[in-house]
Amino acid sequence: MKYHDLRDFMSQLEKTGELKRVGVEVDTYLEMTEICDRVLRAEGPAILFEKPKGHSIPVLANLFGTPKRVALGMGEESVQALREVGKLLAYLKEPEPPKGLKDAWDKLPILKQVLNMAPKKVSNAPCQEIVWEGKDVDLSRLPIQHCWPGDIAPLITWGLVVTKGPHKNRQNLGIYRQQVLGPNKVIMRWLAHRGGALDFREFQLANPGQPFPVAVVLGCDPATILGAVTPVPDSLSEYQFAGLLRGGKTELTQCIGSGLQVPASAEIVLEGVIHPGEMALEGPYGDHTGYYNEQAEFPVFTIDRITMRKNPIYHSTYTGKPPDEPAVLGVALNEVFVPLLQKQYPEIVDFYLPPEGCSYRMAIVSIKKAYPGHAKRIMFGIWSFLRQFMYTKTIIVVDDDIDIRDWKEVIWAMTTRMDATRDTTLVDNTPIDYLDFASPVAGLGSKMGLDATNKWPGETTREWGRPIVMDADVKKRVDTMWQELGI
């Protein structure tokens, strides 16, 4: 199923019971978070709060609160089918030359589809049906959530931030939280290595003293939202990738006040600039780690204009101790990562980011081990392969006889195949998420790799244990007599 815009997606979810409307008044201050947290932990539906206290604009929350809804948003019917999305990304990341005429012919539809997915520019876009300018620009008119008791201010959580560097042909989409400072100002919390921050830095070097144009999209079609959190190859824009997922070109319209382009069917768009040198102290906020993060300075985004559809919908979420929506997204996108990793390291059998690991801080990988030291090669390969894994603190490597999605199996491998000194790899002074207060220095800390594979000659001088396995014929005989046993 493909979706033209957010409302189309919501309509389809509602028909299948995957979206429920809440008609009673609910406060954006804390109440909304508590309701969403309970619903998400129960693997419940997306919620449309029709009467946020003090506001006329409804709030859509818990949209991607189950892996199934993430898959549906990507145009697939099941989480397992996301492997096909990963295979497509792996091919686009490193396309292989055709092995012959037939292979070239087979690959032609994919290449043609990619070329045909350049975004389509439109005018008279729905997202500009209503325009607030001047004194009308007031963020308090939007039902922005105040998620946790210790949060310093309301927080924009699902904003797709659109930027463009001076030397790039394509725009960048990123999701960065934004603390509300006043009627027309928010703090743009982007980390230094993220696309938006890189675009801003390059713009400042090329245009000293000039304001940097930014647009923030609040609520758009699911393919575009998910494209912004997927490891899209640098040769492909997130808008193009969204078109591939959707099976139709992403329709864009130009912002009123800048050359940036935003989804034409977006619900709400914030247009404005970041002035060089204008910074503010951000936080504290409850984060996906389950703790309040420490404060840090980030650029201030000044909003000149707010455009929206008629009867707009505000898309929101919260972050907290797993499971939360980012953790659920991590579980689903895990299936996209597997083919990408297997393309680079064919010996990888499976890869898993347990949601308890705060989306990316711990990874477990199973391999077809082929030589001594193989596990260590995989550890360093994963840490350096995708930007998403730069902050992974712990990697556990096991053999292909272990189901890495079953903690009982993983712990058995760790306790029977590991020696603490020999099989632990520690790496110091590596990039760490600055939100990780456990690291000795903000943004810099250590990583740990655990080799829980069977050891080969060269890794041990001892005779290695053989796992106990029941005779296959006996298992079959017991299977056939099981009903008769009356157990």
From Swiss-Prot:
One of its GO terms (molecular function) is 3-octaprenyl-4-hydroxybenzoate carboxy-lyase activity. InterPro entries: UbiD, UbiD-like_C, UbiD-like_N, UbiD_bacteria, UbiD_Rift_dom. It is an enzyme of class 4 (lyase). Its EC number is 4.1.1.98. Pathway: Cofactor biosynthesis; ubiquinone biosynthesis. Mn(2+) binds at residues 172, 238. Prenylated FMN binds at residues 175-177, 189-191, 194-195. It is a peripheral membrane protein. The active site is at residue 287. It catalyses: a 4-hydroxy-3-(all-trans-polyprenyl)benzoate + H(+) = a 2-(all-trans-polyprenyl)phenol + CO2. Catalyzes the decarboxylation of 3-octaprenyl-4-hydroxy benzoate to 2-octaprenylphenol, an intermediate step in ubiquinone biosynthesis. Belongs to the UbiD family. Homohexamer. This is 3-octaprenyl-4-hydroxybenzoate carboxy-lyase. It comes from Dechloromonas aromatica (strain RCB). The gene is ubiD.
